[in-house]
Amino acid sequence: MMAVAAATRIAVVVVAALAALAPGARGLRRDDFPVGFLFGAATSAYQVGWSIMGCSHGGWVWSLPFLVDPGRISDRRNGDVADDHYHRYTEDVEILHNLGVNSYRFSISWARILPSRFGGVNSAGIAFYNRLIDALLQKGIQPFVTLNHFDIPQELEIRYGGWLGAGIREEFGYYSDVCFKAFGDRVRFWTTFNEPNLITKFQFMLGAYPPNRCSPPFGSCNSGDSRREPYTAAHNILLSHAAAVHNYKTNYQAKQGGSIGIVVAMKWYEPLTNSTEDVRAARRALAFEVDWYGFACYLPFL
């Protein structure tokens, strides 16, 4: 039902937008949208300021490369402060309110909640997200919470090789359960992973994102295997997603009344020619980039 509702609302937006472009159109108004339509904004944890505050140990996989080699960014900046959301979240919530949005999608920093392995829940991290969620709700803004947006604790990268190691699946299960318990009484919309297809592509095939793993001809990295590792990472991510969804639906959904899903970055491929080879290549690319994650099962022709 969620997929159908989302598709319907997207269709409404597209139709309304096209109508607004027609000659003599008066433009879009809020009352052109159905009651209950959610207008929103979105961020991710690292992009708005990781901040050492609220983290008692370690760090995450995105912070280390810029500490070890700050020159990889031309002006030597990193995301440790960014717009300092950790300290200025009340201002950000007020800005959202003034914009008139009624939903806000943000990601939780895994490293802020569980900076070390099992059992080490960071109370300061829990407290920060409680404050943020409560501030949003007080302004009539529905929180949409993403559990993982490209980042993992650095310790798990060292211990398991990040998403390349099967052990990280249990770690994600524990982390997601902590979040359901801590925030689920107020959060109605959960996302396990943001764009897992981009995680595998840019972290393990092209090596553009930390941990920067790749191999020729896809890129020139210090380590990695672009022909194998994206599949291994995707396998572990999808099993982690499935376990978290099962746990939520089994143990939390009836009481908390929320829903849970995954966000996939959509794109489309067209064959260069009508040849069988090109048609199959386009189909494989679409299956690898989208279908595999949307259907959450391995497609044999990959």
UniProtKB/Swiss-Prot annotation:
Domain of life where this protein originates: Eukaryota
Residue numbers binding a beta-D-glucoside: 47, 149, 194-195
Signal sequence annotation: 1-27
Record's keyword terms, sorted: Disulfide bond, Glycoprotein, Glycosidase, Hydrolase, Signal
Biological processes annotated in GO: carbohydrate metabolic process
Catalytic residues identified in the record: 195 (proton donor)
Residues that span the membrane, as ranges: none
Entry similarity comment: Belongs to the glycosyl hydrolase 1 family.
SUPFAM superfamilies reported in the protein's UniProt record: (Trans)glycosidases
Gene Ontology MF terms: beta-D-fucosidase activity; beta-galactosidase activity; beta-glucosidase activity
Top-level EC class as recorded in UniProt: hydrolase
Gene3D superfamilies per UniProt: Glycosidases
Matching Pfam families: Glyco_hydro_1 (PF00232)
Entry-linked InterPro entries: Glyco_hydro_1 (IPR001360), Glycoside_hydrolase_SF (IPR017853)
Cystine crosslinks: 214-221
Catalytic activity: Hydrolysis of terminal, non-reducing beta-D-glucosyl residues with release of beta-D-glucose
Annotated EC: 3.2.1.21
Protein name, per record: Putative beta-glucosidase 17
Glycan-bearing residues: 274
